[in-house]
Amino acid sequence: MRKMKRFVRCRVLVSALAVISALAMASCEEHVEIYDSSIKVGNILLSDNTVISPYGYDRDSHMAVGVIFYTNEDTVLVVGTKELGSHIYTDSIGTVSNVTNDVVSLCGAENTAAILSSGFHSPAVEAVKAFCSPVSGWVLPSAGELKALSRNLAVVSVSMKAIGGDAFTNWQYLSSSQDGSSTDSEKMYYYSVSLVNGFITSVLKTTEGCVRPVIRIR
């Protein structure tokens, strides 16, 4: 009987220790999440160019400018907090030189620079350049960048809501990429992307699409 009592007490003690250990681990993991400043999808870029986890974000003491939506060894992309309305690619038809015209390249910065240096007037690019933010360097995303955002939209949307940013729409988003499938299509069309499903559409350059700015921080 005494052996049985010792055995029961031992099992109770082991169970209690297991519960305490589990609670301690959970508390530790929560602490790590709150102070996670790593470069990863879903973390938040602040106005002082630092990064914070959405779990540690405080609207009273932090100023968010965007959410990380893509990372690899040499590239980190952030999407801005604001929708910039619907705009057209250009107000006239023609090929913009030095724009990368495919659906995979992460080249919004280069494409935006090419559009700005061309003779074409782009209301979409103008909207991005007029975007008011404490961080500079926002661009019109390429089709490849919008596709990358689409792939991580669920995670990004949770963080965007946490910081009070605009929700993403269900409409097609205008990219800085022309339709490169032929010489004629480059003149006439740009690629638009649905963030909901990643679907890409070739759209006449004088047709409006939603504009959301992005920035490359590495």
Task: Give the location of each predicted region.
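Processing junctions and N-termini across compartments
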Residues: 19-22, 207
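An exposed tryptophan-centered "aromatic clamp" motif
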Residues: 121-138, 143-195, 199-201
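Compositionally biased, low-complexity segments enriched in small residues
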Residues: 1, 16, 107-108, 165
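Bacterial N-terminal signal peptides that target proteins for export
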Residues: 2-15
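C-terminal motif of bacterial Sec signal peptides marking the signal peptidase cleavage site
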Residues: 23-27
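Short, compositionally biased
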Residues: 28-134, 205-218
